[in-house]
């Protein structure tokens, strides 16, 4: 009898789970910001010609608040 179960087990192959597609997000699913804290303001007068946005001050403020670490580039164009 155990020989029967051994042979049966060799024929049964577990199928891999199909990958679930992520639901596409549209504007109607996005609500108002929650727990928003305004850290700094960057206005048109804060932009240096040819250097992009001076982000070092804002990045330091955001890092002091905690959260995800992200590398910011001063040459990034918004």
From Swiss-Prot:
Lipidation (S-palmitoyl cysteine): 10-11
GO molecular function: small GTPase binding
Entry's Gene Ontology cellular component terms: cytoplasm; cytoskeleton; plasma membrane
GO biological process terms on file: regulation of cell shape; regulation of Rho protein signal transduction
Xref: Pfam families: PBD
Gene3D superfamilies: CRIB domain (3.90.810.10)
Coiled coil segments of this chain: none
Topology relative to the membrane: Lipid-anchor
Top-rank taxon: Eukaryota
Compartments, record wording: Cytoplasm, Cytoskeleton; Cell membrane
SS bonds (residue pairs): none
Keyword annotations of the record: Cell membrane, Cell shape, Cytoplasm, Cytoskeleton, Lipoprotein, Membrane, Palmitate
Family matches, as InterPro entries: CRIB_dom, CRIB_dom_sf, SPEC
Keyword Signal: no
Subcellular location, principal: cytoplasm
Residues of the CRIB domain: 30-43
Function summary: Probably involved in the organization of the actin cytoskeleton by acting downstream of CDC42, inducing actin filament assembly.
Family as reported in the entry's similarity comment: Belongs to the CDC42SE/SPEC family.
Protein name: CDC42 small effector protein 1
